[in-house]
Amino acid sequence: MINNLKTFILLASLTALLVVIGGLLGGSTGMLVALLFAGIMNFSAYWYSDTLVLKMYNAEPLSNNHFVYHIVSELAHRAGTSVPKVYLINNSTPNAFATGRNPENASIAVTTGLLDRLTQEEITGVLAHELAHVIHRDTLINVVSATIAGAISGIANMFMWLSMFGHNSNNQEGVHPVVGMIMMIVAPLAAGLIQMAISRSREFEADAGGAQISGNPQWLASALLKLDQANHEQYFDEAETHPATAHLFIINPLNGEKLANLFSTHPSTAERVARLRAMY
């Protein structure tokens, strides 16, 4: 209950940040437009975000005969929940995510790199983690926050262009260049911090829930160590193009050398592994 209340407050904060940006752009009219825009985006995220995210990563559905589907099906039956659809992303960087508005309309996507690098037990640990996200309904919260955060980043960029080309010497029209630059920097960082607060505790809960579903915390712990190392060594092009979706993945897919990674939506892999090993 406390975690759900916290998430509601943080999602409301994301929406409020979007409204504030709208107010800075267009006064009271801008605030109303931003609020309407947020409502439309939340509605769209609820119904269509899973499809959009899967298209972003060119995910292809796996057949019911694929061994990954068999693992997901067995885990879902063990957990007493609906069997999600399973998708494959053709990318050598090992990672995975879950999406969908509820367990009945959920999807789990894995990369080809994950299947190539992990053992079947480790793959099972990862899939159980993603299934736990589905059961906890984190998938809806994640995609809604990603949608709003993406909108905030887009509007912040718009702010920058308006500040550069819409400001006149008499200070009568447009956005002041200094204000535009500040918003361009502060707004995405604020959105990222809110996403971080939403996502971190839910990752720990999904780790614990996934370990219970799979029956062996060590499988996920071993997988996380391999995934963390690989994602520091490789470049996930699609994730870099859509950074607002980074928190959907089991391991942060963004390049570790980037400044934005200081505000990671994921807790440290070392802490996650330590908690899993403590479950023995």
Swiss-Prot record:
Subcellular compartments: Cell inner membrane
Binding positions for Zn(2+) per the UniProt entry: H129, H133, E203
Alphabetized InterPro entries for the sequence: HtpX_protease (IPR050083), Pept_M48_protease_HtpX (IPR022919), Peptidase_M48 (IPR001915)
A GO biological process held by the record: proteolysis
Presence of the UniProt keyword Thylakoid in the record: no
Membrane topology of the entry: Multi-pass membrane protein
GO cellular component terms given for this protein: plasma membrane
Major subcellular location class: membrane
PROSITE patterns registered for this protein in UniProt: ZINC_PROTEASE
Essential cofactor(s): Zn(2+)
NCBIfam families found in the cross-reference section: PRK03001.1 (NF002826)
Protein's UniProt name: Protease HtpX
Lineage: Bacteria, Pseudomonadati, Pseudomonadota, Gammaproteobacteria, Legionellales
Gene this protein is translated from: htpX
